[in-house]
């Protein structure tokens, strides 16, 4: 519950569970897990992530961060085991793979994937972007959403720009009339 909620409400990559840090009471930060040509050898500071709550469950994201920070609620043991091995293995991917394995074993996830074509654990992260841009009365700018999710606007648009349709453009324009 905690891992799934943190990912879905904060738009985390699955493997970012390994880098969670709570600062200043209830502000959630994640460290960099991406290794590519652009950031090779660079020290990338942790980025702050923000909850986009479920309607009717306002404050749930902050509640989950508080649970995590308290230490009373933890991530599943198998995920914690992989987090402890990150430095030794020099990779984060096993954290996400373990979460995927854990989800695939649950009855509710099996039911959801059977009912929802194309649903994957990464859909939890994609939910954040969808809420940010398409399911809110106050959409978040592409630049701000991309920054919160830890990628460039180009990357953000390449993944999430396909959600544009004539109907969505018409609705957006109508809101500004």
Show the residue positions of the predicted features.
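Conserved tyrosine-mediated DNA breakage-rejoining catalytic core shared by Y-recombinases
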Residues: 10, 19-63
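Short, polar N-cap/turn motifs at the start of nucleic acid-interacting alpha helices
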Residues: 23-29, 138-159
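Short amphipathic helical patch at the helix-1/turn junction of helix-turn-helix
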Residues: 7-9, 133-137
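Active-site/catalytic core of tyrosine-dependent DNA strand-transfer enzymes
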Residues: 50-128, 133-135
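Active-site-proximal segment of tyrosine recombinases
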Residues: 16-18, 119, 129, 137-150
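Basic, Lys/Arg- and aromatic-enriched nucleic-acid-binding interface segment
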Residues: 1-14, 18
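Catalytic-site neighborhood detector that most strongly recognizes the C-terminal catalytic loop/helix
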Residues: 34-37, 149-174
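Recognition helices and adjacent regulatory flanks at domain boundaries
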Residues: 108, 121, 147, 172-175
């Amino acid at each position: 519950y905690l891992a799934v909620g943190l990912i879905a409400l904060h738009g985390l990559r699955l493997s970012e569970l390994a880098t969670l840090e709570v600062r200043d009471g209830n502000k959630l930060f994640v460290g960099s897990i991406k290794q590519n040509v652009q950031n090779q050898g660079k020290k990338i500071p942790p980025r702050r992530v923000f909850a986009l709550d479920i309607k009717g469950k306002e404050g749930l994201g902050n509640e989950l961060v508080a649970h995590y920070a308290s230490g009373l609620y933890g991530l599943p043991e198998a995920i914690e085991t992989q987090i402890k091995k990150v430095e030794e293995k020099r990779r984060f991917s096993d954290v996400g793979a373990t979460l995927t394995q854990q989800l695939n074993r649950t009855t509710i996830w099996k039911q959801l994937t059977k009912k929802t074509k194309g649903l994957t654990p990464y859909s939890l992260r994609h939910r954040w972007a969808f809420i940010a841009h398409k399911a809110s009365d106050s959409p978040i700018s592409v630049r701000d959403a991309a920054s919160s999710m830890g990628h460039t606007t180009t990357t953000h648009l390449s993944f999430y720009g396909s959600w544009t349709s004539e109907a969505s453009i018409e609705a957006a324009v109508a809101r500004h009339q």
